Structures are given as C-alpha cells and as structure tokens.
C-alpha cells in the first residue's frame, strides 16, 4: 500500500473532472503522503491561478484509546489545519458524518475527514434523503450559562458527560462542537 500514490492518483483524477473519495485507513498513514498533500493537493488551485479545482475527499480513522500502539494512534489534523487550501472535518455523530460528507463531496476544494473509530458504533435517527451540513457552522450540543466546553469528534460525548457532572455541582455548561476545523466557525 502506498498512501503517496493513492493521494497523487486521486489528485490527478480530481483534476480531470472526477470527485474521488479515498479511504486512507489510519490517520497516522497520512504522513506518508505529506508531499502530495502539501505540494500538490493543497496548492493546485493556487498554482493554476484558480483555473483548476481539486474536488477530492480523503477519509481517515483515528484509533486512539484502543491500545492500537504508536503507529495507529495519531491525530494529525492540527498539522493539516495550517496548510492553506485544505478543508478539515471532524464529525461527532452519524448525522454530522452524513451531512458533512455530502457537503465535502460537492466542494471544489480538497477535504480531509478525520473520523474517530470510537464513534463508529454510535446509533441515532438520521434524516432520510439528501441533506448537507455547511462547513464552518458549529453545532451547539448543549445550552449553558456558566462555562463553555468546545469539543470535537469523540470528545463530544465525553464533554456531555462532563457537563452532566458539572450540573450536579450547580454549574451550567454549554457544549460547542465546531464540526469543521477549516473553516472554523467564528461564532
């Protein structure tokens, strides 16, 4: 398996009019394709003066907290957040995963989706049919007046538990889930 070739081939396919969705498995393996991500995927629109778009979605899973060792436990999204040209999504629920993925597929920019495997077993009712969740629009998970907790991905359920504990101590906690890190909702 060569992540560098997978990313490069997807970039080429996107430049020719396709909208590939690439599953790169573990997010740790994204490092193997850094040259393609940084120098090709992220910069193509800029290098061609806006005449080329790169409508491609790269999915990767974050397996932290499951004793998967060093090679399967990274969360590299902070590095990618600092690369101009990339959009970053971190869904925390099945509804967000579906709505954000539909939006990502429609975008003309490259999107990296970081999915926490701890959430894969989560169940909830999801709206039938097509719907989209716009990038850069946070979700208020819980209203509160005393403190705000900002959490992403699998930290959102943990934040809900923390807010419930705080509530027993008379502290009202608001929980915000940004859903996308690039663009980040300015609230």
What are these language model-derived features?
Residues 2-5, 11-150, 154-158, 173:
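Conserved thiamine diphosphate
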Residues 164, 168-187:
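Generic long, charged, amphipathic alpha-helical segments
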């Amino acid at each position: 398996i060569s992540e560098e070739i997978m990313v490069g081939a997807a970039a080429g396919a996107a430049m020719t009019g396709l909208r590939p969705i690439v599953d790169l498995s573990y997010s740790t393996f994204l490092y193997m394709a850094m040259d393609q991500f940084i120098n090709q995927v992220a910069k193509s629109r800029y290098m061609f003066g806006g005449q080329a778009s790169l409508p491609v979605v790269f999915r990767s899973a974050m397996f932290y907290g499951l004793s998967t060792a060093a090679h399967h436990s990274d969360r590299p999204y902070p590095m990618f957040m600092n690369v101009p040209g990339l959009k970053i999504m971190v869904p925390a629920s099945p509804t967000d995963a579906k709505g954000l993925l539909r939006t990502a597929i429609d975008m003309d920019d490259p999107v990296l989706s970081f999915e926490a495997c701890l959430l894969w077993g989560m169940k909830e009712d999801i709206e039938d049919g097509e719907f989209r969740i716009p990038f850069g629009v946070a979700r208020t998970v819980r209203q509160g007046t005393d403190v705000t907790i900002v959490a992403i991905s699998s930290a959102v359920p943990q934040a809900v538990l923390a807010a419930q504990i705080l509530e027993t101590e008379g502290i009202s906690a608001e929980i915000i889930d940004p859903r996308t890190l690039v663009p980040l909702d300015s609230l």
